[in-house]
Amino acid sequence: GEANRGLGYMFQMMNGARIDVGLGAACISSAAYYASLEYAKERPQGRKLTSKDPLSPQIPIIEHADIRRMLLFQKAVVEGSLALLFQCGIYEDLEHVTEGEEHENYNLLLELLTPVAKTYPSEMGILSCSQGLQILGGYGFCEEFPLEQLYRDVRIHPIHEGTTGIQGMDLLGRKMMMKKGKAAQLYLVEVRKAIKEAEADAELKPFADKLTVAVAQLEKVTLHQFDVAAKQGPEMFLADATLYLEFFGIIAIAWQWLRQATAAKKALQKNPGEADTNFYQGKLAAFRYFFGYELPKIEGLSHRLLNGDGLTVTMKNEYFED
């Protein structure tokens, strides 16, 4: 390479490594999901709340709504994360086979999504593995089952190749403003393509409308953050960059779930066999879970990001003492 270009070359390498970290976290989370799913199918405990017969046989814990909620959380996180990582892989492939402006556009999309693809699977992978361990109960801590190992293994991923805090500052402080905001605009075009396609399906349109609102919130929050940067300086601007990354990540995964739901609906119209039908219905269930349970979390994050009071900037070290 050229002299005095080492730092730039290193960051090119780091971008690929960061996506690999996200993929590693998603793989660990996937293993945890399947391990807890298998256990939930086999472990009998309790009875249906509607059952009045104390002598009736106990049911597998997967029959309990709270267990299904935890499994749906795992499925939504794992498969949403993998979809985003695959999307990054597509952009990387297209970057290699295109030239000129088209090549630059795919490069910008990949650059923008790299901190998200690294962080969302890593941070949410910890929570996903935690839910898997919770499903196993006390057995989750025992070496006879894989969850305790997976839970420990996934914890490193928000740390190495750039901590979550660094990724947040990279996204908000650099990637969103890259090429005068061109990367962000290209990304919004991609999301709106998915929204437009989903709107053609009457059952998916309400979900497409929810993502439209989320995208508008993303634009509002981002413009507000840029205003903070101009008027209050870099410390205030980047104080909650990690929260901005979380906010952005939830919307990005919602985008991927809307695309998966659109594909699943089209596949079901072809009347597939029982196994494929269950697969696509499972996709739609996880999609509904994400839009019903995870996407609403952006409301609180949006409020926080629009109403920053600088507490973390002005807090004195002495105030942390007992």
Per-segment meaning from a language model:
Residues 1-17, 37-62, 221-232:
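A glycine-rich, basic-preceded beta-loop-alpha segment at the flavin cofactor/substrate interface
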Residues 41-55, 86-103, 133-144, 267-275:
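Short, glycine/acidic-rich hinge or "gate" loops at secondary-structure transitions
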Residues 70-133, 217-236:
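Accessory "access/gating" subregions that flank catalytic or transport cores
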Residues 87, 104, 108-186, 289-317, ...:
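Alpha-helix capping/hinge segments and adjacent helical runs
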Residues 178, 194-322:
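C-terminal amphipathic alpha-helical interaction region
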